[in-house]
């Protein structure tokens, strides 16, 4: 969907088909051996010319020309060289054609050449064609071997064709071929890729029983998979059965980090060093990445220092993690300075992942100009932006409120041939909703389904939020019903919260509480936002008693109140005329050990409640306490007190006049 101010519909452009052989009239006489007697052209000369020619179409033209000249008859070797060249270029049909020519001329295909043919099918993602070719192997005068079977299995693994892997493996055993460690490793990867960890562990035992000793790849594959599904402890037990290697340690460190067991990961790193196993760049980068993600940037830099002391140079992923950590800490300047130092100091070549870290970082800090500058630089140096690059920029423009910018990046993305995914579609829906272009947003969601990119719950949440914020509640409720009925997308608590917020803001509090019954019937767990939204709505609707009942339910449900909840409780007490109780709540929060403290809203609400209860002196005392606590009064705070004193003076004047 190309977008402009009117948001026109998507125009999909099919890529032109390129013929596999270029039919040219190029003069390739200079490639022929300049011999006075062309009949003396030798196999060695032809092979040399074919290998030296970097242009595949020219090499193929030479191959055909020399055959048509009757000066040379191609041999198995010249066929093999040409087929390998075409295979490396991914020209499947040309490879197939020359194989057929070899067969017609009675030449046998060697094992290595057949493996090259299988490899070209893998390269272009045609695993089934590779299997079909394999089962015709004898037509080309080549016998199956363990090596060929292994390459077929590996090709199938590349496309995760697990059923076909089992079928080919069964035929391999039927034909009397004993699997080797490479065969088993392919099978282990297939099992682990499909979360069949128990099967992989059994296969390890089978390997040993058959005298095929598992290698580092075997154990690393299984232990990595175990860590992925949370079986880190079991993975460590398995690792203790054999000589440890760095790749296994890396898998375990990664598993411990995913479980947030950083202490265990550090201890494992120490154990590696004690056993004489040097941590590599993956070991350090894994730890640095999790430390940066958790905001422990200083500790991450200490690991970088340790890494450099041990002579282990960082790679581009180490750099990306550290730059991301700087952005998360809010130090944009440090992030850019670190980037420049490491690029120059270590000669690192940034890739799209590294550039995306910069783009995302700048966008998250609202510096869209810098983000676009990085994007332009990527295009200039030939580093193609990917879907994450475009998604970050669209989201950055959307958050900044620039629909034109988001549309510009959207159209650049489509022009480049990069198809949007559900996240980018959702970002664009959000951008359109921010500018009240709800028809266009609805149209985009319809297009998603047609493009086989089903809208997700967050997509509908963005649309519903936009509608609710604009007061289009009836439309929002219609979308809410459609998302499940038409798109089979059940709402989550965020969806309900957006609707509750819309209803509460429209003072339709009864409908909001009616919606909570549906939430209960569906068994959807309430979040803190659910309670806070209803608390706010109840207070604004003049129902402080119901708001306080909600707090009781919140406690029973085991939800911890946050600063928003406490401010709502204080407001509810004040609206009930219980300002003293609200002040006690303020004292309780101030003395507690919670992570948060009363803010300007908390104090202002209590001051308002005290003034409302004719306790203006207490309000002034609370103001002084607020200032001494380092909290700056807002305009609302001063307005409450000024209005209180003005009203009191008016009342006094009225009383004196009446007397």
From Swiss-Prot:
It comes from Arabidopsis thaliana. PANTHER family: PENTATRICOPEPTIDE REPEAT-CONTAINING PROTEIN GUN1, CHLOROPLASTIC, PPR_LONG DOMAIN-CONTAINING PROTEIN. GO terms for biological process: mitochondrial RNA processing; RNA splicing. NCBIfam families: PPR (TIGR00756). PROSITE patterns: PPR (PS51375). It comes from the Eukaryota. PPR repeats lie at residues 75-109, 110-144, 145-179, 180-214, 215-243, 245-279, 280-314, 315-350, 351-385, 386-420, 421-455, 456-490, 492-526, 527-561, 562-598, 599-633. InterPro entries: Pentatricopeptide_rpt, TPR-like_helical_dom_sf. GO terms for cellular component: mitochondrion. The lineage of its organism: Eukaryota, Viridiplantae, Streptophyta, Embryophyta, Tracheophyta. Belongs to the PPR family. P subfamily. Keywords: Repeat. This is Pentatricopeptide repeat-containing protein At3g48810.
